[in-house]
Regions:
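Rieske [2Fe-2S] iron-sulfur-binding subdomain
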Residues: 1-239
Length: 239
């Protein structure tokens, strides 16, 4: 549920992005290879996250705009050339102009289009969840592109990665917290009431990067499903 939450990376992933920066400075003279670059991104300051856009749609779906700049490395250039050869330069540019980080197809799917990855989140019980990761090879693309996908999946999303262990720890603490005798309410109030209707082709609602719009949107959809409120009007308030 923290996929499109921009409040957690700089705190939750501090240990991993600081380790990446330390290794880069001490061992690589400041060079930041791909494996470290994708870890380092979590250390961007709060202003960076606030400037992202969060889009939410009816029935709990949402996505976050990209946190990495459009790559211009030799592999990305070779991929564009192969795509342009198959689809034409205009269509290739249009395809690659769709730049998103995390996408949530509520309740259980999360495609990551930049790295050809698809995650399926399967609840097993109230405190057990199975996460399956699928990677895709793009027909006609340079074979090194698939290797980059594997690297991203292993470094960022693998259960044994130094990034995912941060998230798993947070999930475990949330589960523990919900069993305590504390308050019954879980706050989702960041930027509540400030989200706006999006007038672009996508429709839906849009909030700035610090908004908790995506999680409010998910809980609103969950409530609709539990109460069978199929005809309830789409609202930004959540529940």
């Amino acid at each position: 549920e923290n996929l499109n939450d921009t409040g957690h990376p700089i705190a939750t992933h501090e240990s991993s992005y600081k380790a990446a920066r330390q290794y880069s400075n001490q061992e690589l003279d400041g060079e930041m290879p791909f494996q470290l670059h994708i870890i380092d991104g979590n250390g961007e300051p709060p202003e960076f996250w606030a400037n992202l856009d969060l889009h939410a749609f009816e029935f709990g779906h949402s996505y976050m705009t990209a946190i990495f700049k459009a790559p211009n490395d030799p592999l990305s250039q070779a991929y564009f050339a192969s795509l342009a050869a198959a689809k034409g330069e205009d269509t290739a540019s249009e395809i690659l102009s769709v730049s998103r980080h995390n996408t949530i197809i509520y309740p259980s799917c999360s495609p990551h289009t930049s790295f050809q990855q698809w995650r399926v989140i399967r609840p097993i019980s109230v405190d057990r969840t199975l996460v399956e990761i699928f990677t895709f090879e793009l027909e006609g693309a340079p074979p090194e592109l698939l290797q980059r996908t594997f690297i991203y999946s292993n470094v960022v999303n693998s259960p044994s990665s130094i990034v995912m262990t941060d998230d798993v720890h947070v999930y475990a603490e949330c589960q523990r917290g919900l069993t305590t005798q504390g308050g019954d309410w879980v706050s989702q109030h960041r930027n509540a009431g400030q989200d706006k209707s999006f007038e672009g082709d996508d429709g839906g609602l849009i909030g700035e990067g610090s908004s908790e719009l995506p999680i409010r949107n998910q809980f609103s959809a969950w409530k609709r499903y539990m109460l069978d409120e199929r005809n309830q009007e789409f609202r930004s308030t959540g529940s």
